[in-house]
């Protein structure tokens, strides 16, 4: 065996070739459509979404002049578009809505470690909230751009750095409205990311050194502020690290969601994450006064073995009521959706085992319901003229 030497030019060619392969894979997954398309719904799924019996669909269609769906060729069944489904939800008032005059809420999905289903959970949560009648903005704060990819946009092929957070971070834009893009999913917009966003980890500390009094941790909060009147919920996907942008996302948030597998190393990493964040907050002026409407930790990639059960008891002891008991299983349904650059909500019908599909989707539905309940409580607690700022929360509480 001879020594294999790899030059920087070789790595450049490797990067270009791998990017080409990824584009080909993405195009193949989207075929025959060049762009990602929204799912369709059956009468049964419309009924489930609205919390009614299927037998009521025909009656309510006529009574409220709701979308009747279209006949599927060669079948008696009907299918409904995503927009049809949202019209039904809004018309029947199935879920709580943002009260008039109150600001939209920001939720950051965070973890110190990769491979914990953080991004897929964040995008699925954003989609599920739209299915509950809310207008949602997804902000991708990870230079890898996986959330952007799941929103139907190729981060390297279709996103220029000027379309990311970077112009605002550099001070070239007054807020983040310039970066908001529509997606294939009705009522879901995105501020995309690409590898150019990695420059934020140099730009923010450099700006802090140049400008006395510059609060690098509040940049994202300031940029989001005007968007709170335009969106009911803003979901932020963070990088798997406690980077400058992740700190910004956590300071900007009203609620935090941490996906964490019940695995010893993942649990240890989560403890380290909260410890470092709490120490950092203590060193930042005003940040220690930060308050969250909720902080919740959910089990992800759960296996039904003794080790997982043991680690779940550790997590409950460590985090107490912040662990809400939702368990998203390790599932072939998730793997099959991911292989198509999709979330479970992108599928019009189960791709494979119906039972695996339901086992995976049900806890994600419960997560969306839990988050929406927390948002409703937070909105109710706000006076109508309240600012969009959070109240008081000691970050160290999550270490209890």
Each model region followed by its residue ranges:
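P-loop NTP-binding core
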Residues: 1-49, 54-400
């Amino acid at each position: 065996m001879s020594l294999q030497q790899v030059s920087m030019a070789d790595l450049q060619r490797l990067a270009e070739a791998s990017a080409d392969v990824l584009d080909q894979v993405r195009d193949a997954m989207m075929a025959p459509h060049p762009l990602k398309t929204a799912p369709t719904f059956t009468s049964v799924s419309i009924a489930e979404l609205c919390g009614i019996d299927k037998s009521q669909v025909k009656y309510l269609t006529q009574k409220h002049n709701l979308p009747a769906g279209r006949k599927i060729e060669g079948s008696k069944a009907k299918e409904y578009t995503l927009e049809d489904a949202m019209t039904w939800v809004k018309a029947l008032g199935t879920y709580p809505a943002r009260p008039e005059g109150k600001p939209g809420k920001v939720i950051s999905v965070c973890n110190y470690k990769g491979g914990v289903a953080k991004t897929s959970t964040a995008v699925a949560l954003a989609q599920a909230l739209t299915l509950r009648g809310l207008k949602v903005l997804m902000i991708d704060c990870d230079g890898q751009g996986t959330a952007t990819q799941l929103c139907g946009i190729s981060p390297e092929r279709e996103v220029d750095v000027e379309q990311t957070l970077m112009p605002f971070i550099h001070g070239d834009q007054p807020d983040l409205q310039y970066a908001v893009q529509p997606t294939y999913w009705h009522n879901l917009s995105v501020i995309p990311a690409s590898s150019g966003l990695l420059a934020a980890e140099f730009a923010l500390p450099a700006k802090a050194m140049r400008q006395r009094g510059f609060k690098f941790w509040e940049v994202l909060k300031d940029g989001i502020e005007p968007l709170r009147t335009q969106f009911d919920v803003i979901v932020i996907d963070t990088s798997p690290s406690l980077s400058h942008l992740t700190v910004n996302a956590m300071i900007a948030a009203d609620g935090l969601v941490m996906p964490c597998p019940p695995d010893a190393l993942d649990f240890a990493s989560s403890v380290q994450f909260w410890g470092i964040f709490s120490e950092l907050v203590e060193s930042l002026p005003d940040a220690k006064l930060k308050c969250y409407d909720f902080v919740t930790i959910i089990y992800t990639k759960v296996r039904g073995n003794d080790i997982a059960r043991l680690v779940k008891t550790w997590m409950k002891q460590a985090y107490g009521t912040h662990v809400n008991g939702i368990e998203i299983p390790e599932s072939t349904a998730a793997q099959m959706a991911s292989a198509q650059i999709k979330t479970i909500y992108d599928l019009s019908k189960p791709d494979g085992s119906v039972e695996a599909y339901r086992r995976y989707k049900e806890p994600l539905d419960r997560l969306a319901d839990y988050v929406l309940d927390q948002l409703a409580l937070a909105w109710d607690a706000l006076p109508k003229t309240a600012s969009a700022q959070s109240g008081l929360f000691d970050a160290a509480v999550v270490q209890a």
